[in-house]
From Swiss-Prot:
Its EC number is 3.5.4.33. Keywords: Hydrolase, Metal-binding, tRNA processing, Zinc. Catalyzes the deamination of adenosine to inosine at the wobble position 34 of tRNA(Arg2). This is tRNA-specific adenosine deaminase. The keyword Chaperone does not apply. It catalyses: adenosine(34) in tRNA + H2O + H(+) = inosine(34) in tRNA + NH4(+). The gene is tadA. Its cofactor is Zn(2+). PROSITE patterns: CYT_DCMP_DEAMINASES_1, CYT_DCMP_DEAMINASES_2. SUPFAM superfamilies: Cytidine deaminase-like (SSF53927). Transmembrane segments: none annotated.
Length: 151
């Protein structure tokens, strides 16, 4: 099981968010090849602006592993993490994040800011952009429907 497999699992989570009228972002956390947690955006459902897929996946992984640090774990997410989520990755000490679409408005990894490579922080998170057209298409479809008041 490689990057593409795990990103497709995250994409299934993003589709669940889409079906609920949430911004379609899905995330999973993997440790030693095992999926530890899965989540999708739940901001609308939970009425919580911090209920991003990454934040929920981090919380669940910490709970399951009974730790506040996710050393040796990787996050696979369908959209570049925002600034809040990027800093949460630093705080969680996760090893690496792999994302499949860029976020030109709110990206906290490479598109707008680069939190993960900030030299003044105590932890560096490796990152990789691994494009999956299906992730970008799902986001485009969602925002098109939102603009046309279909969602």
């Amino acid at each position: 099981m490689g990057k593409e497999y795990f990103l497709k699992v995250a994409l299934r989570e993003a589709k669940r968010a889409f079906e609920k009228g949430e911004v379609p972002v899905g995330a999973i956390i993997v440790k030693e090849g095992e999926i530890i947690s899965k989540a999708h955006n739940s901001v609308e459902e939970l009425k919580d602006p911090t209920a991003h897929a990454e934040m929920l996946a981090i919380k669940e992984a910490c709970r399951r592993l009974n730790t506040k640090y996710l050393e040796g774990c990787e996050l696979y997410v369908t959209l570049e993490p925002c600034i809040m989520c990027s800093y949460a990755l630093v705080l969680s000490r996760i090893e690496k994040v792999i994302f499949s679409a860029l976020d030109k408005k709110h990206g906290g990894v490479v598109s707008v800011f680069n939190i993960l490579d900030e030299p003044t922080l105590n932890h560096r998170v490796k990152w990789e952009y691994y494009p999956l057209e299906e992730a970008s298409e799902l986001l485009s479809e969602f925002f098109k429907k939102l603009r046309n008041n279909i969602i």
